[in-house]
Amino acid sequence: MSLTSDIKQELAQVHVAKNSVRAAEVSAILRFAGEMQAVGGKLVIEANLDSMQVGMRLQEFIQGLYNSRVDVHTVNPTVSRKTPRYLVRIIDNADEIARRTGLVTRSGHVVKGLAPSVVSGTISDAEAAWRGAFLANGSLSDPGRSSSLEVLCPGQESALALVGCARRIGIAAKTKDSRGFDRVNVRDAEAIGALLTRMGAQKTRMLWEEKRIKRESRTPANRLANFDDANLRRSARAAVAAAARVERAMKILGDDVPEHLAEAGQLRVQHRQASLEELGRLADPQMTKDAVAGRIRRLLTMADKRAEDLKIPDTNSVVTEDLLEEI
């Protein structure tokens, strides 16, 4: 399986609780993979995707948000195309969905960029826009001199809007016109890694980073990359252990968790292998890594004290060898 397939499989399983964030992802998928056409005097919206999982996710989100029927059809391979495609078709209430997702304005004019609600939305909305755009038409090449994370765009306006979303989450992305198509790409290795985490593909990021480090270690000038690989695994294990402890802490404390500590804890649980610095960037508003570490430390201390009082297993009880061997 390619890195691109790995990412899409992982992103298709990202849990999204807020409806506004779900709507931002839907809007981006429909913008970057969708097409509107009139059939028999009625508007039909279709999204052409390369993953059944993505198609099912889009179907679930649209039906949940807009209470409209959505069909997913498999388009069999052809002589020129050896893999199947998946067509998500929206007929029921398509006019209303087009307006609510920002594909058209209230007066019915086509929006060429991203929906205003996404462009001016929250950090989570910007992350969802990138997740949706990548699920629709994104790719990631193997690490190397020309490695890049790229999204094929329907036009210059949508490309510029995606660059703007990247800027809002601290990622440097650029537009380019290649073979008559507008594209947005990220070439810096650190930026690619950070963007994968932002979108929710932390496991694939670890795989990509491991491939990058192994490639670099093949050259004499980069022999120390092996140490980086070991450090990366140690950091990942520590992060996973912390996430498990935080989950246990939340169970111990229940509703007594202070809101600011709960927010830091949720970040740790949702992004299990991210560094403290990355968690700080994921926070809204953003925090320093020391602030994140301090809040998580206070949460664990508070839970361990409660566990001691109640004479129940503390947060360290969940950190087992089996847990760490998975990394």
From Swiss-Prot:
The lineage of its organism: Bacteria, Bacillati, Actinomycetota, Actinomycetes, Mycobacteriales. One of its GO terms (molecular function) is DNA binding. Involved in cell division and chromosome segregation. The gene is whiA. This is Probable cell division protein WhiA. Belongs to the WhiA family. Keywords: Cell cycle, Cell division, DNA-binding. Residues 275-308 bind DNA. GO terms for biological process: cell division; regulation of sporulation.
